[in-house]
């Protein structure tokens, strides 16, 4: 996920290559022994664009390993980093403009990514980070701030999910203790095992990163800036941070305060009804799902571990690359088994419930109840709010519904009639276009950028 830039980790070709797929003049890449360098237009230049100087910077770090590589260069100011103007797509083996990958408003300066690593990305792309700005990020030009960002390890290391390991390492430095633990198969109790926590606590381990959240108070942020983020696996996540729930708790006074301070706090990441629409924030979707929110028994409560595993099982015969590309979904949770482990009564009458042939796309629980309505990493991603198809929601939010995401040639009127016939869902009033024109065409022509991408 995060690596030092070395010949073993950099996948793009830096051997005297010119990249034109960037804003302004082309970027030139060079290799100096084991070092990687880039020459490009100075993103911090504030004078006339025709006078923008060129700068040469060393690439020191990489984020991304499955879909793309983002290259970070040392700015020369303290420990602050910035991103090259291009991003390398791994499957396509090509460069694209950074603005095509890291979406931002068209009027936002390209220089605003300076320091993003130190203030934002470091929180989830490293283990035990400390942002260490002398004044709050964005409170003044980063060139005027002292930046001394540190992290214990790059990437998601053991302690990110299992908690501090010092006591565990000290205790198990004794070979006799290690041997006894091995033959008895007992945990030493000195590390957190997320899969053994209750569904809420185990999901919060993932939610520390996979959520839209904010500190409750500025003082909390100041402490985290200097001492590190206070949450540890096994803690109650909401004790130290506010996790946004515009769907499940739209009247939250804390949420209203953040929206007043930043109108994009919600609309930048959620559909208008509060459902998450961007990738990497699946915890917000999970906690608004009835399978999590309304469950009363732990064994029947949906959690991240209901479907995903962070360590590939020895019983999983798939190559590790295949497992990783399925978002680390367990081999026995890729199909309807994920839902039928709880909804057992559906098994003998599945086609009666779905009105589709067993084994077809329309008979897959995921496709109807977790459709591809989130966007990120240049692709559509399944919603992690378990819901049912609704034409009314498509009308009010603009969010594609599961039926029309499969039946691309059908109208919202057609879908409304089918849902009414099968499930008694009252169809909403539609205008002429919604009755006569395929919903997919309406979304492509009238939807916002996120909808068109889906």
Residue ranges and their predicted role:
Residues 1-64, 70, 83, 90-106, ...:
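Primarily the internal scaffold of c-type cytochrome electron-transfer domains
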Residues 120-125, 157-160:
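Residues within well-ordered beta-strands of beta-sheet-rich folds
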